[in-house]
Amino acid sequence: LLIHGKLPNAAELTGYKTKLRRLRGLPWTVLDALETLPAASHPMDVMRTGVSVLGCTLPEKDDHNTAGARDIADRMLASLGSILAYWYRFSHSGERIDVETDDDSIGGHFLHMLHGTPPPQSWVKAMHTSLNLYAEHEFNASTFTARVIAGTGSDLYSCIAGAIGALRGPKHGGANEVAFEVQKRYETPDEAEADIRQRVANMVLDVASAPAIY
């Protein structure tokens, strides 16, 4: 829907999933670059770097045609999880994993690579719920950044790399890290609700409570 402007029918969805599975692989240039990044790298920096190297290896046509841009968007949709998981497994345990799994979905593919085994369906469902919520996010800083870069006539890889840079900031995607730290304070849902209500009443809000909308 975000890339092609409409929801697919059953046959189109099957074909699209097949296409995305074909695009999960990474060129050797990207793999080599990922292997140079230290384990202490921020995951957003890793993805930004992966997108930049991918753009150098498989550049967009100078005419920026719509069909080509959609193909690039599909490739990034399919391979960003591969970029992150390959770097993580290599940098933390020295494993050169196969990023081309047969998993039926983006969430299943990423979780399989991250943990090395097919994930439970409950994990996949949770991952997809999270991805859908992010896709529903309004006109935020990273979207704004991507549009500004696109408005200069730059290529799609630059747009996405810039958007990732904006998303990395503590007042945007970095707020999720703050939210996770908040969640770790609590042992039970009741404890969480009571504390959050108290914080709201006292006007004590974390950055994760109110990210900027552009």
Regions found by a protein language model. Name each.
Residues 1-214:
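Hydrophobic alpha-helical bundle cores within soluble ligand-binding/oligomerization subdomains
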